Amino acid sequence: MNRRDFMKANAVIAAASAAGLALPAGASNLITSSEQTKLEWNKAPCRFCGTGCSVMVATREGKVVATHGDANSEVNRGLSCIKGYFLSKIMYGRDRLTSPMLRMTDGKYDKHGEFTPVSWEKAFDTMAERWKATIKEKGPTAVGMFGSGQWTVWEGYAAVKLMKAGFGTNNIDPNARHCMASAVAGFMRTFGIDEPMGCYDDMEAADAFVLWGSNMAEMHPILWTRVTDRRLSAPHVKVAVLSTFEHRSFDLADLPMVFHPQTDLAILNFIANYIIQNNKVNWDFVNKHVNFRKGTTDIGYGLRPAHPTQMKSKNAATANDSTPIDFEQFKKFVADYDVESVSKLSGVPEHKLLELAELYADPKVKVTSFWTMGFNQHTRGVWCNNLMYNIHLLVGKISTPGNSPFSLTGQPSACGTAREVGTFSHRLPADMVVTDPKHRKIAENIWKIPSGIIPEKPGYHAVEQSRRLKDGDLNCYWVQVNNNMQAGPNINEEGLPGYRNPANFIVVSDAYPTVTTQAADLILPTAMWVEKEGAYGNAERRTQFWHQMVKAPGESKSDLWQLMEFSKRFTTDEVWSKAVLDANPKYKGKTLFEVLFKNGQVDKFPLADADPKYMNDENDAFGFYVQKGLFEEYATFGRGHGHDLADFDTYHKEHGLRWPVVDGKETKWRFREGSDPYVKAGTGFEFYGKPDGRAVIFALPYEPAAEAPDEEFDMWLSTGRVLEHWHSGSMTQRVPELYKAFPDAVCFMHPDDAKKRGLRRGDEVKVMSRRGEIKTRIETRGRNKPPVGLVFVPWFDASQLINKVTLDATDPISKQTDFKKCAVKVIKA
């Protein structure tokens, strides 16, 4: 042993001794070879939220063994949140699924049978048999898919192709419908193009930050560190936080405001009125770049048509309509929202409302507004987004460093996959929609499929899918990368009945047993994160790639492999109409795999193009560079149309690029001359998503929530996440450190509400609504401090399914669920 190895050995022995550990006599031999302890490090975006942190991933002997923040990342600059620290453990839970499982009795499929391990061949045989029979009997509208903002870009793209171009149905929707659909509709209505115009660089330039329904301290902690650094480094910077309850982000707030649920609409209109009444309108900007419209009102709440609340609405069928108005009409509309009436309605003191409005009105103050689920999970979520843009447009505080209305994404690729790829039931890639015949034609040409394959009618959105499953209209259903039986609303009445409907066949692809897999008929084991090559797109339009670093356990396969392999089971004769095939005989007898994935475009990149240093299971399975082919075909949709992506190989070299990427250069601020290559010289600003290049300011009122407390159900319920857990906890609750940090959900309640009900901290209670109930324990201290009359229950805990209690009301425009407001009562269990 040389001196260096001797010193290393003694260091290990000393450390072990200090920790009270005994090493075997020959332990020094274990470390004499550096090859045996060598770690391979590679970059990957974090698996969790929409921030898009980059992490360095260490592998050894075929396993991920460590992660740390990537110091070269512009997003997180070497930092990780508590979930990011434990990324190395999310794939190694003891109950990881490793083989397909089919409900069987006596060797045959039985909806009421026990889950039994089967081969992939048997799984796909059974699945295809059900799909074919359903399509033959009822047509393609009876099959559907529920996907995810956690799909990789090419997984989502392959799913869209399979459903819309293969099966000829638009019945595909992502779980991003629950989190970002209102943001999408807000962007499209105001700007005609989706996703934020600003970027994270705004955080180093802003003079004020305003959080609307966003607990960044827990939900976007790395971004919150940048906000905190700016606030503490620059004494003039102010932070305002608005929410229906107090949370950790309030710790930094100079201007904290707790408002009554749903009254954010009135507060937003008050700010617009204040700007106008105090002569703070940026007339040069408004005259050149803005139009005014009045939106349709009394639009309902997205409930079933026969629901008494829904039946009262007058304009549900025309919810997205609007009519032109002028500035004077808009001024008159918002004039009713004066500080006295809005303070009374919202519960926010007048002086705080005035101070908030002045932040926006003062031309010397650069303002960045952040919002997430408090705005989007709202029966008027689209309106909230539109009203937020109204304020920034009135004062011209937009598309410049520090001036940004910024919708923060929740999932790692809700932007990059759900939105940009177009995995929604009404969308196609690059902001195109199925209802536009020109858009359908473009997609059919790029996909090299016959005209008429893509239906013009949008498919069933997320909540509608559950209803249609229950009603027997949707009979074959494939769920990937989500846990909707825990995450969806009103699961007792509208979720579980559809999954267990005897007429339906439910397939769930997942890495772990979940509430949703328990309700399935067939479970497919899925590869996770760096067990496959992937790409995500984050909240600032940054696309990031990673290589496959380890093998998935057992027979687990990526969602991409599952989609492509399943497509081999169908020929065009089984899924396309006779009329289409007679008019296009060259497609007859071909498999959907041949039409969609071996079409001369997706399969044109050879295996030699892949980096030989990295494994790639999909390449091995299909014989070509699958991810590159899918990405380059997909990128065709956006190039030259304001959604430009760089070439595939560039992303593996970079730490992500913000689109549009033109001539190799990313775009930080969209719509501004000199920053955005799509803005014409001499215009200053151009909102080119609209034909006339002008953004829209909407006149939209305050309207009440779908369900409010009454004498029997006397409290508001709000649900949400906590720092330690990701969504339904199916990954994070299997990490011991994260589980121990927050093992069980609790009901956060104001001490006065507890006292009124004869309750004390730690008491077991029932949280009950008209739809269902759960048992939990009362928490009157800690991070979340609801006002009197409201309780907060996080939804990560599968043993406390709070979505038994929630209402399946949605925004009538975006179809996004309101998880923040329903009426409950809390009683001692």
From Swiss-Prot:
Pfam families associated with the record: Molybdop_Fe4S4 (PF04879), Molybdopterin (PF00384), Molydop_binding (PF01568)
EC code: 1.9.6.1
Catalytic activity of the protein: 2 Fe(II)-[cytochrome] + nitrate + 2 H(+) = 2 Fe(III)-[cytochrome] + nitrite + H2O
GO CC terms, sorted: membrane; nitrate reductase complex; periplasmic space
Post-translational note: Predicted to be exported by the Tat system. The position of the signal peptide cleavage has not been experimentally proven.
Binding-site residues for substrate, renumbered to this chain: W795
GO biological process: cellular respiration; Mo-molybdopterin cofactor biosynthetic process; nitrate assimilation
Binding site for Mo-bis(molybdopterin guanine dinucleotide): 83, 150, 175, 179, 212-219, 243-247, 262-264, 373, 377, 483, 509-510, 532, 559, 719-728, 803, 820
Compartment(s) where it occurs, according to its Swiss-Prot or TrEMBL record: Periplasm
Domain 4Fe-4S Mo/W bis-MGD-type: 39-95
Cofactor: [4Fe-4S] cluster; Mo-bis(molybdopterin guanine dinucleotide)
Signal peptide annotation: 1-27
Regions crossing the membrane: none
Binding site for [4Fe-4S] cluster: C46, C49, C53, C81
InterPro entries per record: Asp_de-COase-like_dom_sf, CT_Nitrate-R-NapA-like, MoPterin_dinucl-bd_dom, Mopterin_OxRdtase, Mopterin_OxRdtase_4Fe-4S_dom, MopterinOxRdtase_cofactor_BS, Periplasm_NO3_reductase_lsu, Prok_molybdopt-oxidoreductase
CDD domains, A to Z: MopB_CT_Nitrate-R-NapA-like, MopB_Nitrate-R-NapA-like
Cofactor info, note text: Binds 1 [4Fe-4S] cluster. Binds 1 molybdenum-bis(molybdopterin guanine dinucleotide) (Mo-bis-MGD) cofactor per subunit.
Keywords: 4Fe-4S, Electron transport, Iron, Iron-sulfur, Metal-binding, Molybdenum, Nitrate assimilation, Oxidoreductase, Periplasm, Signal, Transport
Subunit structure: Component of the periplasmic nitrate reductase NapAB complex composed of NapA and NapB.
Family the entry assigns: Belongs to the prokaryotic molybdopterin-containing oxidoreductase family. NasA/NapA/NarB subfamily.
Function according to Swiss-Prot or TrEMBL: Catalytic subunit of the periplasmic nitrate reductase complex NapAB. Receives electrons from NapB and catalyzes the reduction of nitrate to nitrite.
Protein name: Periplasmic nitrate reductase
Organism of derivation: Shewanella denitrificans (strain OS217 / ATCC BAA-1090 / DSM 15013)
Organism lineage: Bacteria, Pseudomonadati, Pseudomonadota, Gammaproteobacteria, Alteromonadales
Gene of this entry: napA
